[in-house]
Swiss-Prot record:
SUPFAM superfamilies: Cu,Zn superoxide dismutase-like. Zn(2+) binds at H83, H91, H100, D103. Residues 1-18 form the signal peptide. Cu cation binds at H65, H67, H83, H145. It comes from Aquifex aeolicus (strain VF5). The keyword Oxidoreductase applies. This is Superoxide dismutase [Cu-Zn] 1. Destroys radicals which are normally produced within the cells and which are toxic to biological systems. InterPro entries: SOD-like_Cu/Zn_dom_sf, SOD_Cu/Zn_/chaperone, SOD_Cu/Zn_BS, SOD_Cu_Zn_dom. It holds the Pfam family Sod_Cu. GO terms for molecular function: copper ion binding; superoxide dismutase activity. Its cofactor is Cu cation; Zn(2+).
Length: 169
């Protein structure tokens, strides 16, 4: 009896692992050099993004967004286009008419320019075929800006130039 139960548990556990949705993005700087990585994991509440990066401005507050196209052409990363906004909202976590699905809290670097943070984005999914899927046609990208997002100014929060980018794979 217990052997059958153990076998059933093993099968169910294997199935749940196989069904877990996760992906990653390699983060590159304006020279195209890899400076970090983000792991993206689907949860019941949205997508958990675990970001680790280095060689960013030290002791800085920096905007961190999901952009609408999966391209990261240095040095300016304009190829990633604007913020991911499938629901046509206004920009900003503090905007009553927002936010964009790609809007996320600012990140903070340490005195050496390193960041290690986890951000839950409840507005996006890794499930294919959904309007807010990061796997939409053309893909999406994670972008780090050189300044903080003010959480309200349209279209991008006065966050400054794009200093790092990673295509969601």
């Amino acid at each position: 009896m217990f052997e059958q139960w153990d076998a059933l548990c093993a099968v169910l556990f294997s199935f749940s692992i196989a069904q877990e949705l996760k992906t990653h993005a390699d983060i590159v700087n304006q020279k195209g050099e890899k400076i970090g990585k983000a792991e993206l994991i689907q949860t019941n509440s949205g997508v958990l993004i675990k970001l680790e990066a280095s060689n960013l401005p030290p002791n800085a507050e920096l905007a961190f967004h999901i952009h609408e196209l999966g391209k990261c052409d240095p040095p300016d990363f304009k190829s990633a286009k604007g913020h991911f906004n499938p629901f046509k909202k206004k920009h900003g976590l503090l905007n009553p008419e927002g936010p964009h699905a790609g809007d996320m809290p600012n990140i903070h670097t340490d005195d050496k320019g390193n960041v290690r943070v986890q951000v839950l984005n409840p507005f996006v999914t890794l499930k294919k075929g959904k309007k807010n899927s990061l796997f939409k046609e053309g893909g999406t990208a994670l972008v780090i800006h050189g300044g903080p997002d003010d959480y309200k100014s349209d279209p991008a929060g006065n966050a400054g130039k794009r200093i790092a980018c990673g295509v969601v794979k």
